[in-house]
Amino acid sequence: MQLKIMPKKKHLSAGGVPLILFLCQMISALDVPLDLVQPPTITQQSPKDYIIDPRENIVIQCEAKGKPPPSFSWTRNGTHFDIDKDPLVTMKPGSGTLVINIMSEGKAETYEGVYQCTARNERGAAVSNNIVVRPSRSPLWTKERLEPIVLQNGQSLVLPCRPPIGLPPAIIFWMDNSFQRLPQSERVSQGLNGDLYFSNVLPEDTREDYICYARFNHTQTIQQKQPISLKVISVDELNDTIAANLSDTEFYGAKSSKERPPTFLTPEGNESHKEELRGNVLSLECIAEGLPTPIIYWIKEDGMLPANRTFYRNFKKTLQITHVSEADSGNYQCIAKNALGAVHHTISVTVKAAPYWIVAPQNLVLSPGENGTLICRANGNPKPRISWLTNGVPIEIALDDPSRKIDGDTIIFSNVQESSSAVYQCNASNKYGYLLANAFVNVLAEPPRILTSANTLYQVIANRPALLDCAFFGSPMPTIEWFKGTKGSALHEDIYVLHDNGTLEIPVAQKDSTGTYTCVARNKLGMAKNEVHLEIKDPTRIIKQPEYAVVQRGSKVSFECRVKHDHTLIPTIMWLKDNGELPNDERFSTDKDHLVVSDVKDDDGGTYTCTANTTLDSASASAVLRVVAPTPTPAPIYDVPNPPFDLELTNQLDKSVQLTWTPGDDNNSPITKFIIEYEDAMHDAGLWRHQAEVSGTQTTAQLKLSPYVNYSFRVMAENSIGRSMPSEASEQYLTKAAEPDQNPMAVEGLGTEPDNLVITWKPLNGFQSNGPGLQYKVSWRQKDGDDEWTSVVVANVSKYIVSGTPTFVPYLIKVQALNDVGFAPEPAAVMGHSGEDLPMVAPGNVRVSVVNSTLAEVHWDPVPPKSVRGHLQGYRIYYWKTQSSSKRNRRHIEKKILTFQGTKTHGMLPGLQPYSHYALNVRVVNGKGEGPASTDRGFHTPEGVPSAPSSLKIVNPTLDSLTLEWDPPSHPNGILTEYILQYQPINSTHELGPLVDLKIPANKTRWTLKNLNFSTRYKFYFYAQTSVGPGSQITEEAITTVDEAGIPPPDVGAGKGKEEWRKEIVNGSRSFFGLKGLMPGTAYKVRVGAEGDSGFVSSEDVFETGPAMASRQVDIATQGWFIGLMCAVALLILILLIVCFIRRNKGGKYPVKEKEDAHADPEIQPMKEDDGTFGEYSDAEDHKPLKKGSRTPSDRTVKKEDSDDSLVDYGEGVNGQFNEDGSFIGQYSGKKEKEPAEGNESSEAPSPVNAMNSFV
């Protein structure tokens, strides 16, 4: 039994109150449980017009349900049908269905008639429709003799079919004797009556087997008419003989074969009438003849043809309108037209109507004492008559029921009792038919029960509707309540819809919709509940779509279709070609998500679709394969897509809108995706933000919107080349205002003064405001107190100052957004603090432990937390040197500060000065500043090693002594006990000699070293020492002089320079670098730095260049041996001049050759003039060159080697020869200038280096 639910009220509130549906007494599409007492209900019956196959048994159905089970009876032709008296008739057990056995004996025609079934129990009786039983008939065609038909080319023709009348009417079609359908066209077609019409005949119409067939579906038989022969001839073939032999009947020559305007073959005349019943298919037909073949047009004179229900059949010769109604009545005109004219025919259509329901009566379940109504409302043309029956008996003669009142098409029940239960029949009839409906009234008292299976699991794809069933029953009618979870969480009206039958609908199911839902049914007799479970699954999506492909014939192509799906659902991928199965060809192969087509052929071109199916959903994507010839083609020009256009907004809702667009040209590269941007003209005009992205195959997008935003949208397309220009903006769409859906972020509470609390937050922007009048509700209260919240509503600002607060007290703070529509959700409280003040108490019990001469450890006791009056940031130590134990360093030094974070109560003081007095104090620090200082605590550092002496200079160098001068260390770090001097010689190969140690009293600042080697370089190491040990050293180098006559070098010392640093960049792979252009006798500080990934590191050292050395050559111009030599040379020159003068005066020649050969001197070679006599008077005895200042050997012979060495030793080298005038080419010590033309010898003093080397 099905009951109708009519909602009276829906109730909804938050905070865990369930969604409640109040229902009255009518329940729709709901069965009364079969274990409850109920009147009969007809569940199955044969059709009203029941045509049977006479060769099979007759089965007349009648099934019903009820409690107790009903009994069945039949009437035939209005009288009781006693099945017990007819051995061929039986009734199925537990059923009212009749079976008439006519296959063994009997005839179907015997059982023709009108049958009606009645199902009855103690609560009432239900009746079936009147079932008209008729056997089907398929009579044979009457035998007839059909003469051949001969027509002139171009004449019209109608081949009659006229099948025998059968039941039901036969289906007509024309075929040849090979059972092939005859071709039809605008010229040749079959009419609705089965005749075959030729608008004009052609020679190709000639054939002898025009056969009309009639198919009778019920008997599955086909009847055949005798074949008709047709011959079409031309005018030339008509001669007198043929014409004489043909009768008028045989020769259809009434109409000329010349061209002619149309005339109608059917229907006849200019007007006709057609009547059709409402809901049927209206078929109008116009077939015309003419030459050329006419074309048919249809119009409705008083209106438009209904576009969705109008169809043209039979080459527009038949107009069909489906599901006709009274509104389709009117005049329809068909127009036949060819080149020679047109003809019209008007068909007047009247639509009548058999009865149809406006409100059919529904079963009614009432509890004792309740009221109810049965309504039976029908319409038709003509208007149907309504009559009531009760339990199959006209209500006028039925037993009277005081709870019942009839009012036309309505029966009103009041204060019903159990005896009021009955089955009522409503009959609506007119001349075109009738409607009969059964509806029971069942009076029950029954507590609620849930009919849906317990713990039913529903699985739904995300973002799709979810329908949770709660079929129920009870009397009185229960109220339905839905809870989420077993304890009942709130159901929001914009998320849930409760249907009349108790079904809960979630229009857009989300992941958070997953869970258990409880349905509760209640009435005054009790309650029942049921739990169902909902699982939300991820949708199946194709994340890699097959792509458009252009391949050459004979090549291979692959399509990929990658699917993303819910992990609990297993998809199956199916490939289709042009929406059909793939060809059964081994060239097509599929593997998981790939389709491969090998040896591509022309027929392989088309649309390939991959479909991923799961048990809950599916997804599809398509790509086009284009097959081209394997000849080279010009390369296409690829570019970014053209912008989309024709943007349109549809389905405009408060929080969503559908955007549709038309893609631009893809410029030979398929579009892979569309990017949608929006502009908020109200809050951020001119600023476009990202909204969504969709695949390149979509042209619509469902966009989620925010309240109170004036949206404009634009779309960009993207392919493998790049992104298109934006489309033109869409029309603007202003969404409705709503309360804010979020609160400000970054809420903080920090005081700036000891008596205030500054509450700050990041304001919402205009897009987040969701409506006009954005404000903030600021609330605060002390965290540890019982105070109520204090609140204030402020304008759209970002801070609020609370004054008069205690110092540094924790507060709970909330900032809630609101606008003219309402409040945002309740925000969570955050903790802040009122303003800080300076700490009140100094750390106590300060202790100092000296670790070594440069390090001390300080300990102190922490201050009480309340005295900090703020966030404890740490402790700060101030320390300073009050005085140094050394007399040299008793000067004021500024205080130094060390801060120790957090709650530490000790710390180390590094970098102290040894042998010094220090003082310190400790202070606590918070966000406001420092507290008072502790009592100063003094301490003393022990002695340490001293620093290097401040300077070191080498003064007054002599042949065997050097004097050192220095300044004491700048930081003695204790009492100096002595100085330590170490030195060692350095030879010409820079090797160091033995090291000599020397201790010097601490009160000295000058010291002379004696008994040193002359002209020797020494390296000195000098440092001071205390009782702790030696300090850093300072180094220096110096050279003793050659002799006392030398010019004393300048003082050499190591001190501080004033020059700026010079920088040289050196390749990182080198390990040395030469410094040039340094000053002699100067100390330099060298710093070498390296920079890499870990940072910059450096080291430095001090070195000193050597002193400028005085020349080790003695001034020979003042030496006695040199003066004597010069006198001898001058005398020799004078003698030579005298000899030359005498010889010239005498003009004689002297034999001096032998003498020259005997005493050949390589230094004095004969240099003859033209007469060959010059040089014969050169006497070796007169030339006495010196060898290192010694006398000539006793044998008075001068060797070449000695002479050469002598001259070279004096700096003249190979140029130390005589000129023609007897003078030296080279000069000693440069005392005499040379002539300009005399060689390249320099007139300057000899090199000090060469002079020094001559003495080594």
Curated annotation (Swiss-Prot):
Detected in sciatic nerve. Detected in brain, especially in the cerebellum Purkinje cell layer, inner granule cell layer and molecular layer (at protein level). Detected in neurons and Schwann cells. It is a single-pass type I membrane protein. Residues 1151-1171, 1193-1202 have a biased composition (Basic and acidic residues). Residues 1151-1256 are annotated as: Disordered. The chain crosses the membrane at residues 1120-1142. The modification Phosphothreonine is found at residue 1173. Residues 1240-1256 have a biased composition (Polar residues). The modification Phosphoserine is found at residues 1178, 1203, 1206, 1223, 1242-1243, 1247. Residues 40-128, 135-229, 261-350, 355-442, 448-535, 539-626 form the Ig-like C2-type domain. Residues 1143-1256 are cytoplasmic. Constituent of a NFASC/NRCAM/ankyrin-G complex. Detected in a complex with CNTN1 and PTPRB. Interacts with GLDN/gliomedin and MYOC. This is Neuronal cell adhesion molecule. It comes from Mus musculus. The lineage of its organism: Eukaryota, Metazoa, Chordata, Craniata, Vertebrata.
